[in-house]
Amino acid sequence: MSSARRRALGFSFQALLLCAAGWHGAAQADGVSALRDFVQNVQSGRATFNQTVTSPDGAKKKTSTGSFEFLRPNRFRFDYTKPYEQQIVADGVKVWLHDVDLNQVTVRPFDQALGSTPAALLAGASIERDFTLANLPEEAGLQWVQALPKAREGSIRSLRVAFRGKDLAAFEITDAFGQRSRLDFNRFEGNAAVPAARFKFVAPAGADVLQQ
């Protein structure tokens, strides 16, 4: 797998998972309250997304699009459609990263996604235990929340989550190297009837399977 694709999959696996923690809930007085409500009350959901990754100097940007589904506890999938077809599927025990073009699959234990990472929110861990939350000023009609990981050894420098009214609107992560990745969400359905079968992954015939 090329370094560029590995980086794209790595971001998806680690950073996007915060989005799976919750999407749609009752209107809140502030973003922190909305985030807490999402984590506690949203059991499933689906949406489409646009992702933009910006280099530390701001000179280079990469864009991608796809769809997202989750079902608590610990099940989610991301399907990238452009520019490369990729899948990330978690069944509660393992996480499967599938590069369709290369027919290559990387498998990781699910517990590697836990701790002071966005995956902790997906798994239902305590927000205050793993993150320090703070409301940020409103920008362009969006209520922003900052979530700083309490563990300093991870690859995440900071997370920002945005709400528009009662809906999650955007998610932004800055990694340890200063690279910024943002996702904007569309057509979300909260507490949707997502079949459990959507989170069962079988490696395609002939795929190169790498265990990590």
From Swiss-Prot:
Key words, A-Z:
Chaperone, Periplasm, Protein transport, Signal, Transport
Compartments (UniProt record):
Periplasm
Task: Please verify whether the record's keywords include Cytoplasm.
Answer: no
GO biological process per UniProt:
lipoprotein localization to outer membrane; lipoprotein transport
Signal peptide range equals 1-29
Q: What is its main location?
A: periplasm
Domain of life from the UniProt record: Bacteria
Q: Mind telling me which GO cellular component terms the entry cites? A: periplasmic space
Could you tell me which Pfam families the record lists for this protein?
A: LolA
The record's section on PANTHER family has:
OUTER-MEMBRANE LIPOPROTEIN CARRIER PROTEIN
Question: What does this protein do, in the record's words?
Answer: Participates in the translocation of lipoproteins from the inner membrane to the outer membrane. Only forms a complex with a lipoprotein if the residue after the N-terminal Cys is not an aspartate (The Asp acts as a targeting signal to indicate that the lipoprotein should stay in the inner membrane).
Q: Subunit arrangement?
A: Monomer.
What the record says about family reads: Belongs to the LolA family.
Q: What is this protein called?
A: Outer-membrane lipoprotein carrier protein
- Organism encoding this protein: Leptothrix cholodnii (strain ATCC 51168 / LMG 8142 / SP-6)
Q: Which gene encodes it?
A: lolA
